[in-house]
């Protein structure tokens, strides 16, 4: 880094309190290069209570340091305290007087203003539009309605024609001290399925202009869903609870209802994924029912019920139970596992016995060889002639 003179900032305590007997005044010397820099107070006349900290090299490659002087609180405000900085490498001299500046307390911040009411429009539930016995409803929800302007006016239109059969529910106060207002319009099943357009117009004094929201059934050619049920996996049968799966694929639009039942009674312990877009533009989903393994093994029948506008009578059902084929397969699998376990046990025992027999044979052979070798050595020592006596006799 090239030579650079420092920037100097005087630091004063920010308090009106006079309870403290002393006050700490500071001087920040920043962004200079190279070292050193000299800091004094009142041109060197003030030395008592002065503490200058070592310089610190910053990531920028420049240095900074600070100096603090402690003075009596009674003197601060009546006497002048000046920080004198001298940086000889850059020929920079700076004098800064520390002035008493008391902080003014800020008033409490007001609560952030609400931007104004927001409007949301929700379609009827798929099951409600597909069953004559149920009542489909389009719901218009207005949130963030202020106490100052609580009155909300709803106007409903079906294909551009205003209707007057909607019902507005009482206002509900929310945690943020605003109101939530809901208006519900009952619709005709076939009107919704035929793609009629529903519009909710909301007027409120907190709005610069009325807000309009429009909704209708998704446009496009309906496609019939294909439904497949899947039994629990073999690996899961070792647990106390098992999963039955229902795959629904190839349907359009995404409005669909999936439920489970057993012996005519609804099953509630199931989870269904949201419809997901497939590569061909249709939708698919999975639904998983969790049941006790004992119920499955007892042969109970579980049914996956699907409702969609493209189905005949808007309804289909696929059942699932432990069939003899599945039971036989599970039994065979268990038997096969048992046979494999028995086979591994047999192989382990055989290998163990084989190794023991090899060790035993090797030990016996070792001792036999040792005994034979010892016998041969003893025999040789017995039959060796005494050639020395024979030579003496010949002489």
From Swiss-Prot:
Residues 1-346 are extracellular. Residues 111-219 are annotated as: CH2. Residues 99-110 are annotated as: Hinge. Keywords: Adaptive immunity, Cell membrane, Disulfide bond, Glycoprotein, Immunity, Immunoglobulin, Immunoglobulin domain, Membrane, Secreted, Transmembrane, Transmembrane helix. One of its GO terms (cellular component) is blood microparticle. Residues 6-99, 117-216, 225-321 form the Ig-like domain. Immunoglobulins are composed of two identical heavy chains and two identical light chains; disulfide-linked. This is Immunoglobulin heavy constant gamma 2. It comes from Homo sapiens.
